[in-house]
C-alpha cells in the first residue's frame, strides 16, 4: 500500500491503515518509536503503549460489547478512540483490527520532539519537560487531544493528527510486562516501552 506524505511538520510518511488492521498485540510493540504528530506542530515519539484485545480481554472497554461510549473502538482501524476517565482526564488509543473487532492500543507516553512551547502552555505551570507527555492523561493534555478528537482518522492527515514513520525502527530488545492501573487482566504482558527511555510513565516492564 502506498503511503502518503504527512502534512505534519515532521519528516516521514504516514503509517497506512493496513498497519493497524491487525491484532492490537501485534500493532502495539511496532508503534514504539513512531511519531504522533499534530497539524499545529506538536509532535512526540511514542515510547510506551498498552494493547487491549476486546472480547478476549477483561480490562478492555469493549469486553462486554458495544456501547455509545466505546462505539469508536468497534470502527475501522487507524482512528483515534478517545475516552474520559476518572472524571477529569482524556486518554487516546489507536483503533486496531478489522472493523468491529473492538481492539486498540493505548498510547501511554511520548518523548516530546516539537512544539514544546505549546505543550508547556497546555500543561500546569512549572511542569518539567520530562513530565509533559509522561503518562496517558498528560500526553493528551500536552498534545491538545480531547473528546472532540474521538474518531479522528490518523491515516488521512486531514483531521489534525497522524502517526508518522520517520525511519526509526521499534527497539529490538522490547520490554514487555503487565499493564498499569487496571483491576483485571493484570497477568497479560501487554505493555511495552522503549528500554531506558526517561519519558516512560512507570517502571520499565519486565517479561
Curated annotation (Swiss-Prot):
Keyword entries, A-Z: DNA damage, DNA repair, Hydrolase
Range of residues in the leader sequence: none
Species this chain originates from: Burkholderia orbicola (strain MC0-3)
Taxonomic lineage from the root: Bacteria, Pseudomonadati, Pseudomonadota, Betaproteobacteria, Burkholderiales
Gene Ontology molecular function terms on file: alkylbase DNA N-glycosylase activity; DNA binding
GO biological process: base-excision repair
Presence of the UniProt keyword Iron in the record: no
Database matches in HAMAP family: 3MGH
Record InterPro entries: Formyl_transferase-like_C_sf, MPG, MPG_sf
Protein name: Putative 3-methyladenine DNA glycosylase
PANTHER family linked to this entry: DNA-3-METHYLADENINE GLYCOSYLASE
Similarity comment: family membership: Belongs to the DNA glycosylase MPG family.
Domain of life of the native organism: Bacteria
EC number of this enzyme: 3.2.2.-
NCBIfam families, per database record: 3mg (TIGR00567), PRK00802.1-3 (NF002003)
Enzyme class, spelled out: hydrolase
Amino acid at each position: 500500500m502506498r503511503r502518503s506524505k504527512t502534512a505534519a511538520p515532521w519528516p516521514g510518511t504516514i503509517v497506512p491503515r493496513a498497519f493497524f488492521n491487525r491484532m492490537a498485540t501485534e500493532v502495539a510493540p511496532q508503534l514504539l518509536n513512531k511519531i504522533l504528530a499534530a497539524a499545529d506542530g506538536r509532535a512526540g515519539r511514542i515510547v510506551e503503549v498498552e494493547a487491549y484485545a476486546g472480547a478476549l480481554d477483561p480490562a478492555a472497554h469493549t469486553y462486554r460489547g458495544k456501547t455509545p461510549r466505546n462505539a469508536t473502538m468497534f470502527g475501522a482501524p487507524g482512528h483515534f478512540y478517545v475516552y474520559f476517565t476518572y472524571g477529569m482526564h482524556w486518554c487516546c488509543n489507536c483503533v486496531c483490527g478489522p472493523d468491529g473487532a473492538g481492539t486498540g492500543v493505548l498510547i501511554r507516553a511520548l518523548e516530546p520532539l516539537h512544539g514544546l512551547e505549546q505543550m508547556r502552555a497546555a500543561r500546569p505551570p512549572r511542569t518539567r519537560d520530562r513530565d509533559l507527555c509522561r503518562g496517558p492523561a498528560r500526553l493528551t493534555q500536552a498534545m491538545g487531544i480531547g473528546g472532540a478528537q474521538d474518531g479522528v482518522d490518523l491515516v488521512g492527515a486531514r483531521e489534525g493528527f497522524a502517526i508518522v514513520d520517520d525511519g526509526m525502527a521499534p527497539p529490538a530488545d522490547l520490554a514487555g510486562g503487565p499493564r498499569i492501573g487496571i483491576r483485571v487482566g493484570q497477568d497479560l504482558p501487554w505493555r511495552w516501552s522503549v528500554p531506558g527511555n526517561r519519558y516512560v510513565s512507570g517502571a520499565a516492564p519486565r517479561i
